[in-house]
Amino acid sequence: MYRRAAVLRTLSFLVATATLGSPPPASAAEADPTGGDPFRSFQWPDLRREFLGTAPVEFDPRVKVSGPVFAEDAMNVPISVSADGLQGIEQILVFVDRNPIRKVLEYFPAGERGTLPSVSFRFKLQQASPVRAAVKTRDGVWHVGGTLVDSAGGGCTVAGETRKDGSWSKSLGEVSAKLYPRSVAPGAGDAGAGAAASRLRLRVMHPMDTGLAGGIPAFFINRLSLRDAQGRELLRLNAYEPVSENPIFSFDFANPPAGKLQLVGTDNNGNRITGAVTGAVIGAVE
């Protein structure tokens, strides 16, 4: 009997010691290697640290990213980003989980001058991946949305058409643009709800080389700025290698900008980009 009691006391001590020495149970966030990512992407924790740092982050349905379910042309994947329900937007950052070059562009709309928080463009996709937009508001919070795009891939590691035929140098830096009316002003908010909205669609001729195709160094537009007739900046865009060749960008405004607009920019080789568009709207866009 005494031996049995001694054994039981010993077992009780060992159990208590093991319990005291074991770590506390992990929280749900700690146990999830994707950091709570809606796409369950293992790249997300690293992406958050790389692009968003230690700032607070929310997965927010008000940040809408639209793209094809399957991209037939991996060198020209259309993406539209809008954050109509958010106020006080400072920056929109677009990045791709599984691209060899993850950052696509940074967009800075001047909301106080009627520029809406929306942008459309095309980019190169290397393989199926979540495509994300992170929207920073004045309170320092990043609001994140995204969409999953499937693709056969390879868009980042092949040369563009104008690079293949050598025609890129003949049109380098040429700008064409039109301003169209829109019947609805998405996200007009304080900028003027119910106003006649407009969309600016512009193209800049440039090969936008990623540097990942054999023998072709990185060569891409890195900055564009649109200014009104008074020289005030309406928007600024920092582009990176994944943006498609001869990029086309679309920007929305709560009201048609008056007078002549001026586009200025540079590429990573220091070439200057300049172009003008009249404030008069032309035609119509759906």
Please provide the spans of the model-predicted regions.
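Aromatic sugar-binding surface patches on proteins
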Residues: 112-119, 241-252
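N-terminal edge beta-strand
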Residues: 47-74, 167-194
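N-terminal secretory signal peptides and thylakoid transit peptides that target proteins
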Residues: 1-15
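Low-complexity, Pro/Ser/Thr- and charge-rich linker/hinge segments at domain boundaries
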Residues: 34-36, 153-178, 283-286
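Structural beta-strand segments of beta-rich domains
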Residues: 75-79, 196-200
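Short acidic/polar inter-strand loop motif in beta-rich domains
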Residues: 137-144, 266-275
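Short amphipathic, basic-aromatic surface patches that mediate peripheral association
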Residues: 203-217
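C-terminal segment of N-terminal export signals and the immediately downstream linker at the start
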Residues: 21-57
